[in-house]
Amino acid sequence: MTTSNKKIRWGVLGYARIAREAVIPAILRSSNSVFHAIASREPSKLDECRQKYNCPKTFQSYEELLRDPEIDAIYIPLPNALHREWTIKAAEHGKHVLCEKPIGLNAAECREMIAASKQHGVTLMEAFMYRYSDNTRKVIEVLRSGALGEIKFIYSAFRFLLGNPGSIKFKPELGGGSLYDVGCYPLNFTGMVVDEIARIQAVATGKPVAPAPMPDSASTSWMKRICRMDWRSRTRS
């Protein structure tokens, strides 16, 4: 992109619900973006996207979409375990990347993705939408002003009803589980409001959450501060 008024042409890897219900509509409403292409391995999803959003290009191969020279940026709403692979491949094709949270499954994956982005001169961003809301900015402003005093303890709870037992959110091998899926929200927010992070300790406890054996709560202790988080997901009985 060589001019400030050029619109960003987006390609989307996968027709996940968050893509079709939130991000694609947002791109279409944006004054500086164009929904250019979608890739999915399921032809029926491509047909739906083409009919619903009048998508100019559809691909059954992620690689083929990445090779499209007209695409500037890639949005990745794939399962968590695939973020590293396709973020790095997108960077290698010279595409900027907006990747769904959590951006990686561990620090090593994140470092690889950051290194690839720097190597190929592209922007990599994790899709935490709340970081740019007026409410979040106001909360941070108040906390950092000292009006409430020093932060000594943070407790957060993030709960929702997951009615589909077959969801990838219940598959550990794909990076599913409440800790990855929603636990990253309170962790990310805490990192925004607590400037100094000198040491991190974590303990996960709790009984298995059906239908997969995953922990449902954890405590994270940071130097001079304690952050307690409960992450729970339940299916309908």
Predicted regions and their residues:
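Core-facing hydrophobic residues within beta-strands of well-ordered domains
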Residues: 7, 33-35, 55, 71, ...
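A short helix->loop->beta-strand "cap" motif at the edges of active sites that frequently abuts
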Residues: 55-56, 93-95, 120-123, 225-228
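Hydrophobic residues in well-ordered beta-strands that form the structural core
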Residues: 19, 59, 98-99, 124-126, ...
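Predominantly a Rossmann-like dinucleotide-binding segment in NAD(P)-dependent oxidoreductases
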Residues: 130-210
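N-terminal Rossmann-like dinucleotide-binding module
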Residues: 1-53
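NAD(P)-dinucleotide binding in Rossmann-like oxidoreductases
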Residues: 207-218, 222-237
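Beta-loop-alpha module in the N-terminal Rossmann-like domain of NAD(P)-dependent dehydrogenases
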Residues: 44, 53-116
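Rossmann-fold dehydrogenase core element
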Residues: 112-129, 150-153
